[in-house]
């Protein structure tokens, strides 16, 4: 049964990677993904990168299936019975860095773990989610994003959206900046109940939901005019993305702690970014509205 579970998830991840890459390429209309197939003693994967497109400056869509003899601390802190236990981890990770500052950055991750505890019993779970990081916020976009997120969760329970939204808000909060990375979405981990079929079905819904949630926003904003002011703000805000990924993100930490393939792990980084000492947006400016209207955690749709 364990082999069947693994085969089903691997097929899903690979197929979802194809669908998402085709959708990005179609919308961009200029650049195509370059594929890097890799294979090491610790696993294998398929890294796909789109660069210097018409709409997207860079997009990474990664599939991987890795193995290890000792589950890294980033995944075992809450699973004491799995410390120093062997594991397998497979999944897909997507990060888009648009060229146009009015198009938000997006992130999707779905992962499946198999591990054997100290009693040699096989333990499995799913994790993942998606979140949105705008530079210039639009209420229409945020409400659309969270409406899709709630729609995904509805068949699995009335409280699921609000549970995973809060988890996302908490997870993507940059403590050293005292601000959110973006406007959130969904985040879940350790999902193994009520059974494999239900947990897998929810994880598949996350993949489809990302497509339904993100690409309509891209199509709506990709033709907006922008200049150096918007570009500079975009590069500055990308700095927050880098800070979170390198300091706080469990996926990045897992890859580093497991001595994973660093090129693939860091492919989520934006190609260009900037920091400015002591910079603050002018009051009542379009840039300031990101901080006052969109980054504060709130319920975007009614309970």
UniProtKB/Swiss-Prot annotation:
Chain ranges passing through the membrane: none
Site (Important for dimerization): 176
The species this protein was found in: Wigglesworthia glossinidia brevipalpis
UniProt family annotation: Belongs to the aerobic coproporphyrinogen-III oxidase family.
Location, primary (coarse class): cytoplasm
Active site: 107
Disulphide-bonded residues: none
Class of the enzyme per the UniProt entry, highest EC level: oxidoreductase
Name of the molecule in the record: Oxygen-dependent coproporphyrinogen-III oxidase
Alphabetical list of Pfam families matching this protein: Coprogen_oxidas
Cofactor(s) required, per the database record: a divalent metal cation
Annotated gene: hemF
GO molecular function (one): coproporphyrinogen oxidase activity
